[in-house]
Amino acid sequence: MDYLGIIMKIAIISGKGGVGKSSISTSLAKLFSKEFNIVALDCDVDAPNFNLMFDVKDKKLLEVIYREIYEINDDCIRCGKCLDVCQFDAIGDFKINPILCEGCGACELICEFDAIEPIKRESGYIYEGFVGFPLIWGELEVGESGSGKIIEHIKNHAKKYKAELGIIDGPPGVGCPLISTVKDVDLALCIVEPTKSSVNDCLRLIETLNFFNVEYLIVENKKGMNNINYPFKIFHSIPFDFDVPKLIANKILLCDSNSKVSESIKELYEKLKEFI
């Protein structure tokens, strides 16, 4: 599927956090960049770390994302109708809490005195950096919502590169951010670790991908950490290695290390090239 100028898009995702998704995606991005014209997108906007692993120094602010909320002005006569209609308990003492307000506009509609008006509030930011290839990532402001909207804007900014390949570090879970990330990708890599919670969450992830007709492969990370029988087919396994936390702490990509994990990720890369 060719959209936004990117010929093929691969999303690296997981049913739960902490399984090594970003560690794998950063290494795959670097490996693919040696043979393909790529753009990397970090769509885990609640906790982006792609830029941290590549230690981006000169980041550029591409866009500020706003959401619409409401505030009460001096025309308020304190009738209380807005308090009754607000479903999010965002109005107290005739002031609207900007964190709780979802911007539905019910309060403005019911107010007979034009005492409630919309305002814009910063909800997130989109940045760009270059690490041998272009990297675009988003950051959701603390306490804000609208991660799906930010992800859509990240994708729109990627179109200018007309890349052969888009490597997307997606969010964990099966919520709105995940759906915004995978709904139009060509291939999803589902990262799972040998724990019951990871397996159960991966099953939910597979169900979501099937609903949206997204092709996927399952990659086991930390193989050997625990014995477990998977209820799905494993495409590739990456071994458990005690040195991985040290490598990450020192901002060393797994593919650049002299470890068994590095060799396994390179093997995964060679297998993935067959899908391009």
From Swiss-Prot:
SUPFAM superfamilies: 4Fe-4S ferredoxins, P-loop containing nucleoside triphosphate hydrolases. [4Fe-4S] cluster 1 binds at residues 76, 79, 82, 111. ATP binds at residues 15-22. It comes from the Archaea. [4Fe-4S] cluster 2 binds at residues 86, 101, 104, 107. Residues 68-96, 92-121 form the 4Fe-4S ferredoxin-type domain. Keywords: 4Fe-4S, ATP-binding, Iron, Iron-sulfur, Metal-binding, Nucleotide-binding, Repeat. InterPro entries: 4Fe4S_Fe-S-bd, 4Fe4S_Fe_S_CS, CobQ/CobB/MinD/ParA_Nub-bd_dom, P-loop_NTPase. GO terms for molecular function: 4 iron, 4 sulfur cluster binding; ATP binding; metal ion binding; oxidoreductase activity. This is Uncharacterized protein MJ0578. The lineage of its organism: Archaea, Methanobacteriati, Methanobacteriota, Methanomada group, Methanococci.
